[in-house]
Amino acid sequence: MCLTNTGEHISIYAYLYGAGDAKIGKIIGGNAGQGKAIKRKFNKAIPAIANLRHAVEDALVYPIDYKSTRGKKTRITWKRHYLYGLDRRKLHVRSPHSALNLLLQSAGALICKKWIVRTEERLLARGLKHGWDGDFALMAWVHDEQQIACRTEDIAKIVCAEAQQAMRDTQEFFDFRVQLDTEGIIGHNWFECH
């Protein structure tokens, strides 16, 4: 997803992962003022993300009166240095601006871990055997991608369907309100599947 501003594009990830005005300005080939304007436009276009960022920061630090601190280095006062992840574990926060990134990275990792486990469970429940002497073998798990070798194309189709259902199981497990999906691609090597 991109936000357009006079022909320039900014990746949503830079914003979500805590890029400041200067960094966003640099990404678009501009300056901090232009970066700030892009962020303002983005927040106006998708207020839910701005609200989420503010809610996360409000849970961590006390508000700063920016008018009284203009031009001075401000010191934040922490309420707490942690947030809770999807699995209720404490996530220790380094800085308020990186807190949303921490939540997103944690959620992504937990979702993918659960998805991998549920895929395996579902395939075994279908009577398939895991291993090089069996029907399928997990060759790689990279970020949000599984690479699974299958004995036949029919088994590969089953793996794709079960991986999709495993993702929906994961959505339900974490009570995730956004639909989670995956895409299965069948090929003879990683290049064909990626």
Kindly give the residue locations of the regions a language model identified.
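Conserved catalytic core of nucleotide polymerization and phosphodiester-bond processing enzymes
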Residues: M1-H194
